[in-house]
């Protein structure tokens, strides 16, 4: 969602829950769960590759594209998410270029990031921003 919103100007509104692939190098320090641990597994076997890994992953990191997002966007994160650490969600949110952005934080929620509570917010958001689309 994030990268597509950044790269496609025709995207008129976006919503991303528990954003993944953000702040790779921070995420590997913040969580010990997979899939991010695959990076640590590789770096333990190839410690000399850390700089190359960081450089390569920057090409795929959503944060690298976030400043190009111009459409309205909402992000929801779970503050106890051990898959996509909330810190990386905060970094993503602060990097988003759109002036119309809102972050929803769900305390007591993990990777589901308040999904069941948040569904109606997403529905209302799209209804507002995609009026007249069929």
Report each predicted region and the residues it spans:
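Hydrolase active-site cap/lid region
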Residues: 3-48, 105
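Short alpha-helix in the alpha/beta-hydrolase fold that links the catalytic acid
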Residues: 71, 85-94, 103
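Histidine-bearing beta->alpha loop at or near hydrolase active sites
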Residues: 103-114, 119-125
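Active-site nucleophile elbow and catalytic-triad environment of alpha/beta-hydrolase enzymes
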Residues: 49-65
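Short beta-strand/loop motif that positions the catalytic acidic residue
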Residues: 69, 74-77, 81
